[in-house]
């Protein structure tokens, strides 16, 4: 290597280092200091370090490049998503096996029984809304990766055990399969159902409630209004960190039409509320399928049941924890509803729950309800839809 070439190489390398260093400082440009951040308490340095790590340009570059290689070469995303056909994405919770699944299912079924008994003691009827997995409803869009054997018959097993435990659980799978001819019941890039899918489920539940005559009182009319349709980036795209360098590789966004539901006589009810404390006859408990207003499941349920519904669903905590919190709430203890709709995605049955925030003795009492002597081995019963 000649002297000139060595100098050129050294200067080029030095220029590259300076350029990369200058580029990397861009991560600090958007940092904003608050009054609580000082050099003395160390909060300023810690906050700057955290912000810089999150906004580090080279880190974003590496993340984007690595994700693009996984996506294009191996048709894979980050843990959390499974890639299907025709830009369909699925939650890996509907695919992966679970260690100790049999024991977890037995424990969760025991809790479901205990919930049913607690509600009955307060004069409330449980309606268990088992939501079929998106991967079960849209098997035609599955790719090379298939759900573990644990999930093969999970929906039917869940329903069989509910019947054996005398838990009222209307079927939602058949109505959803039939509704696919009219439109999507699950979002292509998201874990959740569409507003149409939520409406189909609500109508099926309402028909079952009506057949059993579970609601008393005068019906209340509701109306649902459709809003604008806009592109919607589903939650499963968060496991494909291709943005911003390779955003063109991302699946196209879904189209989501906003729906809102209101009482037909909303103004009259508002006036009546000044003079009367009206007890709401139905409670809804569940997951983000119920809590997120994007899907309008609450509104669809109100319109289908022709009844006001109080929503106690929570986002990000699964179906069991919100129900246990509801059973301990003053709202339930002081004014138990006639019907409690418990939205429960099937994939949560074999999942472990962190119940450390609840009294262990109370949890044990729920698990050892009056039906605890029944054998609920999931392998004992098989049914069809």
From Swiss-Prot:
Enzyme class, broadest EC rank: transferase
Broad class of the protein's primary localization: membrane
Domain of life per record: Bacteria
Compartment list: Cell inner membrane; Periplasm
Signal peptide feature range: 1-21
Gene Ontology CC annotations of this record: periplasmic space; plasma membrane
The protein's annotated pathway: Glycan biosynthesis; alginate biosynthesis
Keywords, ordered alphabetically: Acyltransferase, Alginate biosynthesis, Cell inner membrane, Cell membrane, Membrane, Periplasm, Signal, Transferase
GO molecular function, one term: acyltransferase activity
Enzyme Commission number: 2.3.1.-
Annotated membrane topology: Peripheral membrane protein
GO terms, biological process: alginic acid biosynthetic process
Residues the record marks as active site: 190, 192, 288
Keyword Signal: yes
Record carries keyword Transferase: yes
Family the UniProt entry places it in: Belongs to the AlgJ family.
Summary of the function given for this chain in its UniProt record: Together with AlgI and AlgF, forms an inner membrane complex which probably interacts with the alginate polymerization-transport complex and adds acetyl groups at the O-2 and O-3 positions of mannuronate residues. Acetylation of alginate is important for the architecture of biofilms and increases the ability of alginate to act as a defense barrier.
Name this protein carries in UniProt: Probable alginate O-acetylase AlgJ
Species this chain originates from: Pseudomonas putida (strain ATCC 47054 / DSM 6125 / CFBP 8728 / NCIMB 11950 / KT2440)
């Amino acid at each position: 290597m000649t002297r000139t070439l060595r100098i050129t190489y050294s200067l080029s390398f030095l220029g590259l280092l300076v350029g990369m260093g200058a580029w990397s400082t861009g991560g600090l440009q958007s940092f904003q200091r608050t009054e609580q951040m000082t050099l003395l308490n160390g909060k300023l340095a810690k906050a700057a370090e955290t912000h810089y790590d999150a906004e580090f340009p080279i880190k974003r570059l590496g993340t984007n490049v690595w994700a693009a290689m996984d996506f294009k070469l191996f048709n894979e995303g980050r843990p959390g998503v499974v890639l299907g056909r025709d830009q369909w994405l699925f939650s890996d919770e509907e695919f992966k096996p679970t260690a100790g699944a049999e024991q977890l299912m037995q424990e969760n079924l025991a809790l479901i029984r205990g919930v049913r008994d607690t509600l009955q003691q307060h004069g409330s009827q449980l309606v268990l809304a088992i939501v079929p997995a998106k991967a079960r409803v849209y098997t035609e869009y599955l790719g090379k990766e298939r759900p573990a054997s644990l999930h093969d018959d999970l929906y039917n097993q869940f329903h069989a055990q509910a019947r054996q435990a005398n838990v009222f659980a209307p079927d939602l799978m058949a109505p959803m399969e039939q509704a696919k001819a009219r439109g999507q019941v699950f979002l292509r890039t998201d874990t959740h159902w569409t507003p149409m899918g939520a409406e189909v489920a609500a109508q099926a539940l309402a028909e079952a409630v009506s057949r059993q005559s579970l609601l008393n009182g005068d019906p209340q009319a509701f109306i649902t209004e459709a809003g604008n349709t806009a592109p919607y980036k589903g939650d499963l795209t968060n496991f494909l960190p291709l943005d911003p360098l390779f955003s063109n590789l991302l699946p196209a966004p879904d189209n989501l039409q906003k729906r809102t539901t209101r009482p037909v006589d909303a103004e009259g009810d508002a006036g009546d509320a000044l003079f009367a404390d009206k007890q709401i006859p139905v409670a809804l408990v569940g997951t983000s399928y119920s809590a997120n207003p994007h899907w309008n499941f609450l509104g669809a349920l109100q319109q289908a049941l022709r009844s006001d519904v109080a929503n106690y669903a929570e986002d990000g905590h699964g179906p069991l924890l919100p129900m246990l919190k509801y059973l301990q709430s003053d709202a339930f203890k002081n004014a138990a509803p006639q019907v409690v709709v418990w939205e429960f995605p099937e994939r949560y049955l074999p999942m472990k729950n962190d119940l450390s925030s609840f009294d262990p003795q109370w949890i044990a009492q729920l698990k050892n309800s009056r039906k605890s002597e029944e054998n609920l081995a999931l392998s004992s019963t098989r049914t069809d839809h």
